[in-house]
Swiss-Prot record:
Any one GO biological process: translation
Protein name per the record: Small ribosomal subunit protein uS17
Cysteines paired by S-S bonds: none
Keywords attached to this entry: Ribonucleoprotein, Ribosomal protein, RNA-binding, rRNA-binding
Pfam family name, one: Ribosomal_S17
Length: 88
């Protein structure tokens, strides 16, 4: 029997914390339509992602993918850094 290939979930967001070792916190923002009023409202989710080489910094725009659980709250991994934060 052929196994159906799973699609890997990927998300894009901004790094809001890099204080943990090999872990980043990524803020994912999305727009959803209010069920009654019809106005589009911003909703956000914070996810912990594995950053093996500690290469991300606050403000970077990154892509993460779902992976096996690495820790109690960490089941996403860094795929790519799309845009570096501007350093002052």
């Amino acid at each position: 029997m052929a196994e159906a290939e799973k699609t890997v979930r990927t998300l894009t967001g901004r790094v809001v914390s890099d204080k943990m070792d090999k872990t980043i916190t990524v803020l994912i923002e999305r727009r959803v339509k209010h069920p009654i009023y019809g106005k589009y409202v911003k909703r956000s989710t914070k996810l912990h992602a594995h950053d093996e080489t500690n290469q991300c910094h606050i403000g970077d725009k990154v892509t993460i993918r779902e992976t096996r659980p690495v820790a109690k709250t960490k089941s996403w991994a860094l795929v790519d850094i799309l845009e570096r934060a501007v350093e002052v």
